[in-house]
Amino acid sequence: MALRMWASSTANALKLSSSASKSHLLPAFSISRCFSSVLEGLKYANSHEWVKHEGSVATIGITDHAQDHLGEVVFVELPEANSSVSKEKSFGAVESVKATSEILSPISGEVIEVNTKLTESPGLINSSPYEDGWMIKVKPSSPAELEALMGPKEYTKFCEEEDAAH
């Protein structure tokens, strides 16, 4: 019993979380420093979007850090399928109880799928930013743009420095 309590308090202090329910989608554990989760296997933009590249498809959403700063998301505006997105250009908006923010595309390409669940349940961005709260799936037009994005360690450091400056 004492060991279980110690393990639980240690996990809480380190902000370790298990994603056993969807282990086929994400790494078994993610480490959260201070404020939000940053996952291995994803790329990150300095505008706080993430990209998961699998084969010829890149899934895009906003990071846990971004949704945490936005607060409760109440409305999402997304592009239509078969439209194009351009790197560092707006493809939609997220309205929260705090503000409305444009969402910038971290890469260029053709939108092949839009997460229509967000129309009825925009809060999925808060509860599951890396799984159920994804926004669009894109066929990338420039693989070099993916390589230019930050990895998890770089993004964590970027967020820490950005938060320290504010």
From Swiss-Prot:
List required co-factors. Answer: (R)-lipoate
User: Which Gene Ontology cellular-component terms appear in the entry?
Assistant: cytosol; glycine cleavage complex; mitochondrion; nucleus
Key words of the record: Glutathionylation, Lipoyl, Mitochondrion, Phosphoprotein, S-nitrosylation, Transit peptide
What does the PTM comment state? S-nitrosylated and/or glutathionylated at unknown positions in response to nitric oxide.
Sequence positions bearing Phosphoserine:
141
Q: Which Pfam families match?
A: GCV_H
Task: State where the protein is found.
Answer: Mitochondrion
Q: How is the cofactor bound?
A: Binds 1 lipoyl cofactor covalently.
One GO biological process term = glycine decarboxylation via glycine cleavage system
Activity: how regulated? Inhibited by harpin, S-nitrosoglutathione (GSNO), nitric oxide, N-ethylmaleimide and 5,5'-dithiobis-(2-nitrobenzoic acid).
* Family (UniProt): Belongs to the GcvH family.
What quaternary structure, including any partners, is listed in this protein's UniProt entry? The glycine cleavage system is composed of four proteins: P, T, L and H.
Enumerate the HAMAP family for this protein: GcvH
Q: Kindly provide the name given to this protein in its UniProt entry.
A: Glycine cleavage system H protein 3, mitochondrial
Ranked from the top, the taxonomy reads: Eukaryota, Viridiplantae, Streptophyta, Embryophyta, Tracheophyta
Q: Which gene encodes it?
A: GDH3
